[in-house]
Amino acid sequence: MSTNQIILTDQGDNYLNVWSHVAQDLYNHYGETLYNSWFSKVNFIESSLNTVILCAPTNFVRDWIKSKYSMVILQLFQHYNNTIKSVEIITKELPGTSKTVIELPTKTFADIGSSELNAENIFSTLDVRFTFDNFVVGVPNELAYAAARAVAESTDAVSESNPLFLYGGVGLGKTHLMHAIGWYIKQNNPNRKVIYMSAEKFMYQFVKALRNKEVISFKEKFRSVDVLMIDDIQFICGKDSTQEEFFHTFNTLIDNNRQIVISCDRSPSDLDNIEDRIKSRLGWGLVADVHSTTYELRLGILESKIEQMNVKIPKNVIDFLASKIVSNVRELEGALNKVIAHSNFTLKEITLENTQNILRDLLRSNERIITVEDIQKKVASRYNIKLSDMSSSRRLREVARPRQIAMYLSKTLTPKSLADIGKKFGKKDHTTVMHAIKKVEELLENDIELREEINLLMKILQN
């Protein structure tokens, strides 16, 4: 990282170290290329009344940072000084400012040796966007959220959920919850040693330790922590030596009453090319799935993001995004950011027509249009009932339950109204459909087998 000058007024001297930390964290998290493109020429100008004022070199850079990174920058400032309430970005320096120049530290997370990875620099590996406060909770993720929160808030060495195993598809919130656990512990119990990393990095560090004959240091590093969080554990499938080391690390931490949190794209029982003894241990504690989002959850996520970004978006645009971008949360938020950025840069109003044009490529890639008829056929086949049973009034459990599941999936995977869905199921009214959806949601709270079954049906339908 090249030396960067940071400018601030005399009255902002108490924020000198804060800005240097914020700038360094932006560099660590986003990397040199992105940092140099957007942040390297941003100066700290002034602070007053709990507001930090930054100066961007051009209107374009200012608008881009405001649309993409303003919340990240504010949260970073608040991490170091919680009296800061807002960040303002301008393009012209304030008159009469007395400038003090400092140099950013040049050490990055990549330069930190393995022996230094402790509670003091866990912050470098955590994304400031991912906290419990901005995690939107709904039926698909409420168990995982509650379990993650319990782990973070536990006053004992470990929670009752040890290990906590979170699984689900890409972009549904598993990584968000793991970062949120790390943030909560960092802020409320800073003396606890926490390691968060991907299984891929765990493997690379292990291989490096073998090559450099530093295996003892590697073992000491991972087996002396209070909380170990490993993301995407499926990466070690088929990696025999890494599995062996993970197995012994896992056992040591459990034996020493330390907390473990694991994430994966599938349940422990569905992992291939991994030893049975590891599978067994991964399921010792609480296994919580994060399944595909419902329309209501997607709507809540969009409304939360819009409020955070302090922008106004028409309701029909929000409804359109929630109905059309159904694959995962990451893609949903990306679509929202793209619409807002386009409006900022072109100064065009956000309308449904503009949104459809801006996202046409993304919508085309999502264009595996799922119909109620598709859902009825797949569910009927899965449960070995007649397709005609979907529109019948038969109340036998072996028929009624699949029909309720099909109604739930129709509401989750299609933009159809309750009334429209009811028509497809033998002209049933919207209250019948609403009752079916509510019944399935209640069952999903405690029935792990049903959650896995519905996840599987969603994957089949979406692919």
Curated annotation (Swiss-Prot):
Renumbered residue ranges of the record's region Domain II: 83-124
Domain III, AAA+ region: annotated segments: 125-343
Transmembrane segments: none
InterPro entries: AAA+_ATPase (IPR003593), Chromosome_initiator_DnaA (IPR001957), Chromosome_initiator_DnaA-like (IPR020591), Chromosome_initiator_DnaA_CS (IPR018312), DnaA_C (IPR013159), DnaA_dom (IPR013317), DnaA_N_dom (IPR024633), DnaA_N_sf (IPR038454)
Pfam family, one: DnaA_N
Single GO biological process annotation from the record: DNA replication initiation
Binding site for ATP: 171, 173-175
Location of region: Domain I, interacts with DnaA modulators: 1-83
Entries under SMART domains matching the protein: AAA, Bac_DnaA_C
Gene Ontology molecular function: any one: lipid binding
Keyword Ribonucleoprotein included in the entry's annotation: no
Region: Domain IV, binds dsDNA, residue numbers: 344-463
Keyword field: ATP-binding, Cytoplasm, DNA replication, DNA-binding, Lipid-binding, Nucleotide-binding
The UniProt record lists the keyword Cell cycle: no
Main location: cytoplasm
Function comment: Plays an essential role in the initiation and regulation of chromosomal replication. ATP-DnaA binds to the origin of replication (oriC) to initiate formation of the DNA replication initiation complex once per cell cycle. Binds the DnaA box (a 9 base pair repeat at the origin) and separates the double-stranded (ds)DNA. Forms a right-handed helical filament on oriC DNA; dsDNA binds to the exterior of the filament while single-stranded (ss)DNA is stabiized in the filament's interior.
Notes on the domains: Domain I is involved in oligomerization and binding regulators, domain II is flexibile and of varying length in different bacteria, domain III forms the AAA+ region, while domain IV binds dsDNA.
PANTHER family named among the record's database cross-references: CHROMOSOMAL REPLICATION INITIATOR PROTEIN DNAA
Subunit structure: Oligomerizes as a right-handed, spiral filament on DNA at oriC.
Protein name: Chromosomal replication initiator protein DnaA
